[in-house]
Regions:
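N-terminal pre-domain/capping segments
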Residues: 1-114, 282
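Hydrophobic faces of well-ordered beta-strands that scaffold small-molecule active sites
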Residues: 3-6, 33-35, 85-90, 120-122, ...
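Active-site beta-loop-alpha junctions enriched in small/polar residues
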Residues: 6-10, 36-40, 90-93, 124-127, ...
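A structural motif
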Residues: 30, 83, 114-117, 179, ...
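Acidic/histidine-rich catalytic cores of soluble enzymes
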Residues: 33, 143-235
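Active-site acidic/histidine proton-transfer and metal-coordination neighborhood
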Residues: 81, 90-181, 267-268
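A short, acidic, flexible beta-alpha connecting loop/helix-capping segment that sits on the rim
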Residues: 256-266
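C-terminal helical cap(s) of enzyme catalytic domains, especially alpha/beta-barrels
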Residues: 266-282
């Protein structure tokens, strides 16, 4: 079973020892990577999350979130280490406007075609009211990428899974944008109080990539940035998720661990998480 990793999680390790970290990931049985590229914005977190990130940590984040000007070179290095790369997480500014999103399309097309990117992933981090203004831009970008054979995927956080007047941003945007796929993050869905298995069943034909994240049973807004566990050691229904994955349109190398952080050693967590995913699939 091929299992990958999103580079946001091991960002500090990649910052301190890029090549050594890639080798450790391979030795852990991970076979692919989802890169994160800063296409726009200053990288500052939204104020409503109330995160306090020291400057040194922001510098270390560059290990996993690459500036566009060095992304192609680093991507080539990742592939040289034998890791498959199909997808790129677009790291946008949290206040990205519809006009700015549309304006990125030529750059996305250029980078994607030059680097054999099959999927772009973006995280709006908006509820229903916030997502509505972005719909025309999402349509235009997803349609433009589709013409080049690249699929745009929505990656959810908890905001997209919390209903507003009975409707979630996730449901609304997928209904409005037929060329948009879904990279469901099961951990953020669980954090929001949603049922990740039910979401997988509902959108089974629109999920080519699946993000594994696990959170403690007491995960809440107060501990949002420290609630992560190795996959299979928190509160997500991992066996149910793996059973539902069989009926989804998940591609080879489409199972991706996206553990944001670790209270101990992120690389050890990733290794255990991969083992737990494989065990849950049996």
């Amino acid at each position: 079973m091929n299992i990958g990793v999103n580079f946001f999680g091991p960002k500090r390790s990649l910052y301190h020892d890029f090549d050594g970290t890639l080798e450790r990931l391979k030795q852990s049985g991970l076979t692919s990577a989802e890169i994160c590229v800063a296409f726009a914005g200053n990288g500052e977190p939204p104020k409503e999350l109330n995160l306090q990130i020291p400057e040194e940590i922001i510098r270390q984040m560059s290990g996993g979130i690459w500036p566009l000007e060095v992304a192609s070179e680093r991507l080539a290095a990742v592939r040289t280490h034998g890791l498959t790369v199909l997808s790129c997480h677009m790291m946008l500014g949290f206040q990205t406007t519809p006009e700015q999103l549309i304006g990125m399309l030529p750059t996305l097309l250029e980078f994607g075609t030059a680097n054999q990117i099959a999927y772009y992933v973006f995280s709006p981090m908006k509820d229903l009211n916030g997502i509505k203004a972005l719909i025309p831009a999402i349509k235009k970008v997803s349609d433009g990428l589709a013409e080049a054979g690249i699929t745009l995927l929505l990656h959810n956080h908890e905001m997209e899974c919390i209903p507003v007047d009975g409707v979630t941003a996730l449901d609304y945007v997928l209904e409005q944008c037929p060329n948009l796929g879904l990279e469901l993050d099961v951990g953020w869905a669980k954090f929001a109080g949603a049922d990740p298995v039910a979401l997988m069943q509902k959108y089974h034909d629109r999920i080519p990539l699946l993000h594994f994240k696990d959170v403690r049973a007491d995960a809440c807004a107060a501990n949002r940035d420290t609630c992560f566990t190795a996959i299979g050691e928190g509160s997500i229904p991992l066996r149910g998720i793996m059973a539902a994955a069989k009926d989804c349109a998940i591609v080879e190398h489409g199972l991706i661990i996206d553990q944001d952080d670790s209270p101990t050693d992120i690389l050890e967590d990733l290794a255990r998480g991969a083992e737990n995913i494989r065990a849950a699939a049996q």
